[in-house]
Amino acid sequence: MRIYNTLTQQKEAFKTLEPGKVRMYVCGMTVYDYCHLGHARVLVAFDVVTRYLRHRGYDVHYVRNITDIDDKILRRADENGEVYTDLTDRMIRAMHEDEAKLGVLSPNEEPRATAFIDDIIAMIQKLIAGGHAYAADNGDVYFAVESFPDYGKLSKKKLEDLVAGARVDVQEAKRSPADFALWKAAKPGEVSWQSPWGEGRPGWHIECSAMSTKCLGDTFDIHGGGPDLLFPHHENEIAQSECATGHTFVHTWMHAGAIRVNKEKMSKSLGNFFTIREILEKYPAEVVRYFLVSSHYRSQVDYSEDNLAEAGRTLTKLYHALRGIVPAKEADVAETDHDRRFAEVMDDDFNTAGAIAVLHAVANDINHYRREGDEEAAKRSAAVLVRLGAVLGLLQQNPEAFFQADTGSELTAEDIEAMIQARADARKAKDFAEADRIRDDLLEKGIILDDSREGTTWRRSQD
């Protein structure tokens, strides 16, 4: 297996620190608002990484943190006129609801920053003792960037350029413009904790260093996150952690690609900013997941109605292959060429686009066997399709449930069944004009009928 390491900017053979075990940390949400499409990309990307590593037999210990104290959180709580913990608790519940709909498995641990204040303070004390941090007169504590010669090794930024660029916003308490806060002195009315430097709260970067090393040890296998976190957040994590522990922080750094909307950067100012909730009001959750998985995790993804519609159509093809067939028992299905091809592409830096192509090849086999009347071969291939789909978090629904999923249609399942019965009654009475009218009315509302000798089934259009 080879994984692209942001640190070395190349694919590397993946070797775990401990045989058969993977320790992975991913930066999670700052819970001041609902999760957006960019968050969905990261959630799904590292869910697939976790699923595939487990599929390959690794014991994965996956930690994804929650930032539950931050400037943005305090500002939003103040705007809402609520206690900050009420805001964060509400947003955490919403996040869990969103990720469950997207089929994202829960991490092994989900540490919250506010539960690690003692660990954060202890790490800051280590940094001060080692000459890597200093307390300012105003109660802030800063990391001394120039004390870490390797600063910039992840982002490939030069310290002298960062210092020069930061001079426009020099704070008097800092010794160097590029230094960053480890501890922020309390402001009037803000939540704070007691520390050796007075009342205050932690900086964002030190939170992740303290949580990750506490949960996974001084050195662990994989650290991941969104593209916007590479610098300064992950760069600062490396500096803090390696100065505090004296050990290499992380072996493999992984970053998901950015999301664009209609080929433009997603931003609130452009009016193209979508929360997961807003998207799931328009599209089935599995279609959204399929859309995200269809591209390589490092690639830039363009969100558009056309692309989501295409994702819906192609996912529908896979479910069509499974419709009306009972997959063979897993124990009765040996490893196939498709399994081997799937492993080959996924071993190449989690190439989910290639894996999706394998799923469609299996679906083509199912359709071929059914045309040939070889139901047993079709059942075995269906088991392979469901098995491989599970690694991507796809194709685990009953096909009928997928086809009949309600995504905001004006018609409920009960309404549709009643209209199908009315159509059947009209056909029985040889009133074919009325039967056709009902069929056309349903089609206009996005409901497609499929007639067979066994009766009539229906599905919602994915267009």
Curated annotation (Swiss-Prot):
Q: Residues of the signal sequence?
A: none
Please list the GO terms describing molecular function. Answer: ATP binding; cysteine-tRNA ligase activity; zinc ion binding
Q: What would be the name of the gene that encodes this protein?
A: cysS
Q: Where in the cell is it found?
A: Cytoplasm
- In Pfam terms, one family for this protein is DALR_2
Natural source organism: Marinobacter nauticus (strain ATCC 700491 / DSM 11845 / VT8) (Marinobacter aquaeolei)
Entry similarity comment = Belongs to the class-I aminoacyl-tRNA synthetase family.
Q: Which cofactor does it need?
A: Zn(2+)
Q: What domain of life is recorded for the organism?
A: Bacteria
Extent of motif 'KMSKS' region: 265-269
- HAMAP family per record: Cys_tRNA_synth (MF_00041)
* Residues that, per the record, bind Zn(2+): C27, C208, H233, E237
Its recorded reaction(s) are: tRNA(Cys) + L-cysteine + ATP = L-cysteinyl-tRNA(Cys) + AMP + diphosphate
Q: What name does UniProt use for this protein?
A: Cysteine--tRNA ligase
Provide the binding site for ATP: K268
A GO CC term assigned to this protein in UniProt: cytosol
